[in-house]
Protein backbone atom coordinates (compact mmCIF):
# COMPACT_ATOMS: atom_id res chain seq x y z
CA UNK A 1 0.00 0.00 0.00
CA UNK A 2 1.17 3.50 -0.71
CA UNK A 3 1.59 6.04 2.07
CA UNK A 4 -1.48 7.92 0.89
CA UNK A 5 -3.68 4.83 0.96
CA UNK A 6 -2.44 4.08 4.47
CA UNK A 7 -3.55 7.55 5.52
CA UNK A 8 -7.06 7.43 4.11
CA UNK A 9 -7.85 3.72 4.58
CA UNK A 10 -5.83 2.37 7.48
CA UNK A 11 -5.74 5.25 9.96
CA UNK A 12 -9.54 5.70 10.12
CA UNK A 13 -9.86 1.99 10.95
CA UNK A 14 -7.26 2.44 13.69
CA UNK A 15 -9.14 5.46 15.07
CA UNK A 16 -12.54 3.75 15.12
CA UNK A 17 -10.97 0.63 16.65
CA UNK A 18 -9.57 2.80 19.45
CA UNK A 19 -12.98 4.42 19.98
CA UNK A 20 -14.58 0.97 20.01
CA UNK A 21 -12.19 -0.24 22.73
CA UNK A 22 -12.90 2.90 24.78
CA UNK A 23 -16.65 2.42 24.40
CA UNK A 24 -16.41 -1.16 25.64
CA UNK A 25 -14.15 -0.15 28.54
CA UNK A 26 -16.46 2.64 29.71
CA UNK A 27 -19.82 0.91 29.22
CA UNK A 28 -19.22 -2.78 29.96
CA UNK A 29 -19.57 -2.77 33.75
CA UNK A 30 -22.72 -0.68 33.88
CA UNK A 31 -24.31 -2.67 31.05
CA UNK A 32 -23.46 -5.97 32.76
CA UNK A 33 -24.93 -4.86 36.07
CA UNK A 34 -28.26 -4.08 34.36
CA UNK A 35 -28.46 -6.93 31.86
CA UNK A 36 -26.72 -10.01 33.24
CA UNK A 37 -29.90 -12.04 33.86
CA UNK A 38 -31.65 -11.02 30.64
CA UNK A 39 -28.61 -11.80 28.48
CA UNK A 40 -28.35 -15.32 29.90
CA UNK A 41 -32.04 -15.96 29.16
CA UNK A 42 -31.83 -14.52 25.66
CA UNK A 43 -28.83 -16.65 24.75
CA UNK A 44 -30.06 -20.00 26.04
CA UNK A 45 -30.87 -21.19 22.52
CA UNK A 46 -27.65 -19.89 20.97
CA UNK A 47 -24.91 -22.37 21.69
CA UNK A 48 -22.41 -20.60 19.47
CA UNK A 49 -19.55 -19.02 21.42
CA UNK A 50 -19.83 -15.87 19.34
CA UNK A 51 -23.04 -14.89 21.08
CA UNK A 52 -22.83 -16.52 24.51
CA UNK A 53 -22.09 -14.08 27.31
CA UNK A 54 -22.46 -16.46 30.22
CA UNK A 55 -19.13 -17.32 31.79
CA UNK A 56 -17.54 -14.13 30.47
CA UNK A 57 -17.13 -11.45 33.05
CA UNK A 58 -16.80 -7.86 31.98
CA UNK A 59 -13.08 -7.61 32.72
CA UNK A 60 -12.53 -10.37 30.15
CA UNK A 61 -14.68 -8.48 27.64
CA UNK A 62 -12.64 -5.35 28.26
CA UNK A 63 -9.41 -7.34 27.83
CA UNK A 64 -10.72 -8.74 24.54
CA UNK A 65 -11.56 -5.23 23.29
CA UNK A 66 -8.15 -3.87 24.25
CA UNK A 67 -6.38 -6.86 22.67
CA UNK A 68 -8.39 -6.30 19.49
CA UNK A 69 -7.28 -2.68 19.40
CA UNK A 70 -3.66 -3.70 20.03
CA UNK A 71 -3.86 -6.16 17.12
CA UNK A 72 -5.07 -3.38 14.83
CA UNK A 73 -2.41 -1.01 16.20
CA UNK A 74 0.46 -3.47 15.77
CA UNK A 75 -0.62 -4.53 12.29
CA UNK A 76 -0.92 -0.85 11.31
CA UNK A 77 2.57 -0.17 12.68
CA UNK A 78 3.89 -3.14 10.72
CA UNK A 79 2.18 -1.77 7.62
CA UNK A 80 3.98 1.56 8.07
CA UNK A 81 7.32 -0.20 8.47
CA UNK A 82 6.64 -2.46 5.51
CA UNK A 83 7.87 -5.93 4.92
CA UNK A 84 6.79 -9.29 3.71
CA UNK A 85 3.08 -10.07 4.14
CA UNK A 86 2.29 -6.92 6.17
CA UNK A 87 -0.55 -5.91 3.86
CA UNK A 88 -2.10 -9.37 4.07
CA UNK A 89 -1.70 -9.47 7.86
CA UNK A 90 -3.38 -6.06 8.14
CA UNK A 91 -6.19 -7.19 5.83
CA UNK A 92 -6.76 -10.28 7.98
CA UNK A 93 -6.85 -8.19 11.18
CA UNK A 94 -9.19 -5.76 9.41
CA UNK A 95 -11.50 -8.63 8.50
CA UNK A 96 -11.39 -9.87 12.11
CA UNK A 97 -12.42 -6.39 13.28
CA UNK A 98 -15.19 -6.41 10.68
CA UNK A 99 -16.46 -9.76 11.95
CA UNK A 100 -16.40 -8.51 15.56
CA UNK A 101 -18.38 -5.47 14.43
CA UNK A 102 -21.02 -7.70 12.89
CA UNK A 103 -21.05 -9.86 16.03
CA UNK A 104 -21.82 -6.78 18.16
CA UNK A 105 -24.66 -5.76 15.86
CA UNK A 106 -26.12 -9.29 15.86
CA UNK A 107 -25.85 -9.39 19.67
CA UNK A 108 -27.75 -6.10 19.91
CA UNK A 109 -30.48 -7.36 17.58
CA UNK A 110 -30.69 -10.65 19.50
CA UNK A 111 -30.91 -8.90 22.87
CA UNK A 112 -33.15 -6.16 21.42
CA UNK A 113 -31.08 -3.41 22.98
CA UNK A 114 -27.69 -1.88 23.56
CA UNK A 115 -24.57 -4.01 24.04
CA UNK A 116 -21.08 -2.64 24.82
CA UNK A 117 -19.50 -1.47 21.57
CA UNK A 118 -22.73 -1.11 19.58
CA UNK A 119 -22.42 2.60 18.77
CA UNK A 120 -18.93 2.31 17.33
CA UNK A 121 -19.92 -0.91 15.56
CA UNK A 122 -22.72 0.91 13.76
CA UNK A 123 -20.37 3.79 12.95
CA UNK A 124 -17.82 1.26 11.67
CA UNK A 125 -20.10 -0.30 9.04
CA UNK A 126 -19.74 2.47 6.40
CA UNK A 127 -16.04 2.80 7.21
CA UNK A 128 -15.55 -0.95 6.75
CA UNK A 129 -17.31 -0.77 3.38
CA UNK A 130 -15.17 2.26 2.48
CA UNK A 131 -11.97 0.38 3.34
CA UNK A 132 -13.03 -2.97 1.88
CA UNK A 133 -13.74 -1.60 -1.59
CA UNK A 134 -10.14 -0.48 -2.38
CA UNK A 135 -8.85 -3.72 -0.89
CA UNK A 136 -11.12 -5.67 -3.23
CA UNK A 137 -9.50 -3.85 -6.14
CA UNK A 138 -6.04 -4.93 -4.99
CA UNK A 139 -6.73 -8.59 -4.26
CA UNK A 140 -8.98 -11.10 -6.06
CA UNK A 141 -12.26 -12.18 -4.46
CA UNK A 142 -10.92 -15.55 -3.34
CA UNK A 143 -8.06 -13.91 -1.45
CA UNK A 144 -10.49 -11.51 0.24
CA UNK A 145 -12.63 -14.53 1.14
CA UNK A 146 -9.54 -16.18 2.63
CA UNK A 147 -8.86 -13.03 4.67
CA UNK A 148 -12.48 -13.07 5.85
CA UNK A 149 -12.25 -16.73 6.89
CA UNK A 150 -8.98 -16.10 8.73
CA UNK A 151 -10.55 -13.02 10.32
CA UNK A 152 -13.52 -15.12 11.43
CA UNK A 153 -11.14 -17.64 12.98
CA UNK A 154 -9.32 -14.83 14.79
CA UNK A 155 -12.60 -13.33 16.02
CA UNK A 156 -13.84 -16.70 17.30
CA UNK A 157 -10.48 -17.34 18.96
CA UNK A 158 -10.59 -13.91 20.60
CA UNK A 159 -14.09 -14.49 21.99
CA UNK A 160 -13.13 -18.00 23.13
CA UNK A 161 -10.02 -16.72 24.91
CA UNK A 162 -12.05 -13.93 26.53
CA UNK A 163 -14.52 -16.52 27.84
CA UNK A 164 -11.67 -18.62 29.24
CA UNK A 165 -10.14 -15.58 30.93
CA UNK A 166 -13.55 -14.76 32.40
CA UNK A 167 -14.01 -18.25 33.79
CA UNK A 168 -10.45 -18.36 35.12
CA UNK A 169 -10.71 -14.98 36.85
CA UNK A 170 -14.13 -15.92 38.27
CA UNK A 171 -12.74 -19.12 39.82
CA UNK A 172 -9.75 -17.25 41.25
CA UNK A 173 -11.93 -14.53 42.80
CA UNK A 174 -14.32 -17.16 44.20
CA UNK A 175 -11.48 -19.07 45.85
CA UNK A 176 -10.14 -15.96 47.59
Predicted regions and their residues:
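N-terminal signal-anchor transmembrane alpha helix
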Residues: 2-32
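Core segments of transmembrane alpha-helices
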Residues: 58-79, 100, 123-128
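Cytosolic, membrane-interface loops and tails of multi-pass inner-membrane proteins
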Residues: 24-54, 165-176
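Membrane-interface helix caps and helix-loop-helix hairpins in membrane proteins
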Residues: 80-84, 105-115, 135-139
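Transmembrane alpha-helical segments that form the membrane-embedded catalytic/substrate-channel core
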Residues: 17-27, 97-108, 152-167
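Structural signature of hydrophobic alpha-helical transmembrane segments
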Residues: 85-95
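Hydrophobic alpha-helical membrane segments
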Residues: 93-104, 115-135, 151-154
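Terminal transmembrane helical module of multi-pass membrane proteins
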Residues: 131-176
Amino acid sequence: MSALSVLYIVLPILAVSFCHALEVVFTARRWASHHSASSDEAHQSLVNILFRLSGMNMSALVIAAVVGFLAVLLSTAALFVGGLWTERIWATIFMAYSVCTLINIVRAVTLKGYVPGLVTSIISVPLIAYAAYPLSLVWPWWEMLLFAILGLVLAVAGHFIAQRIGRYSTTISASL
